[in-house]
Amino acid sequence: MIKKLSKLVKDFTLSELRTGMKITAKELVNKKITVQFPEERTPISPRFRGLHALRRYPNGEERCIACKLCEAVCPANAITIESEMRDDGTRRTIVYDIDLFKCIFCGFCEEACPVDAIVETQIFDYAFKSRQGSIMTKERLLEVGSQNEQAINQARLEDAKYK
C-alpha cells in the first residue's frame, strides 16, 4: 500500500520530469562537444585501421612477395591473391584484391605481412558508386600507398613506441 502511495505521489509531482529538465538545463550551459565533421576533424589515433594500401620500396619495386600469409590469416576471406614466378626466381602478385564489403578491418593482414607490404592507412572517408567499387585492386592499393607514403610512415613512427 505504501509503495502504491509513494508511486502516486511521484507521478503526481512529476519528479522524473523535473529530474530530466534539471539535467537538460545543466547541460545547456556546458561547452558543446559536437564536431562539425566535414570542416572540422577530430584527431585520429596512429593505430587507426582504415583503407588498405600496398607499399613500395624506395627504388619503386613493390614490397609484396606473394607469400599469401595475409590471405590465409584474413578471418573474413576478403583478400584474393594470385601470383607468378618471375625470371629471376622471385614470386610476385598478379592479382591482389581486397573486398571492402567483406573486410572487418581487424589488421591481421598487416600483422602477418613479413615485409610490411600491406598496411591500413588512416583514411576513413571513402565511398563507392557501385558494388564493384568496393573491391580494391592491386593497382588501386599501390596508388593509395604511393599517395600516402609519408602519412603511413609518420603513423608507423608514432605507433612504434607502443609496440
UniProtKB/Swiss-Prot annotation:
Keyword tags: 4Fe-4S, Cell inner membrane, Cell membrane, Iron, Iron-sulfur, Membrane, Metal-binding, NAD, Quinone, Repeat, Translocase, Ubiquinone
Annotated residues that bind [4Fe-4S] cluster 2 are located at: C74, C103, C106, C109
Question: What are the required cofactors?
Answer: [4Fe-4S] cluster
List this protein's GO terms for biological process.
aerobic respiration
Q: Name one GO cellular component term.
A: plasma membrane
Q: Which residues form a coiled coil?
A: none
Membrane topology term: Peripheral membrane protein
Binding sites annotated in the UniProt record for [4Fe-4S] cluster 1: C64, C67, C70, C113
What EC number(s) has UniProt assigned to this enzyme?
7.1.1.-
Query: Which proteins does it associate with, and in what oligomeric form?
Result: NDH-1 is composed of 14 different subunits. Subunits NuoA, H, J, K, L, M, N constitute the membrane sector of the complex.
* Protein family per UniProt: Belongs to the complex I 23 kDa subunit family.
PANTHER family, per database record:
NADH DEHYDROGENASE [UBIQUINONE] IRON-SULFUR PROTEIN 8, MITOCHONDRIAL (PTHR10849:SF20), NADH DEHYDROGENASE UBIQUINONE IRON-SULFUR PROTEIN 8, MITOCHONDRIAL (PTHR10849)
Protein name per Swiss-Prot or TrEMBL: NADH-quinone oxidoreductase subunit I
Q: Which organism is it from?
A: Ruthia magnifica subsp. Calyptogena magnifica
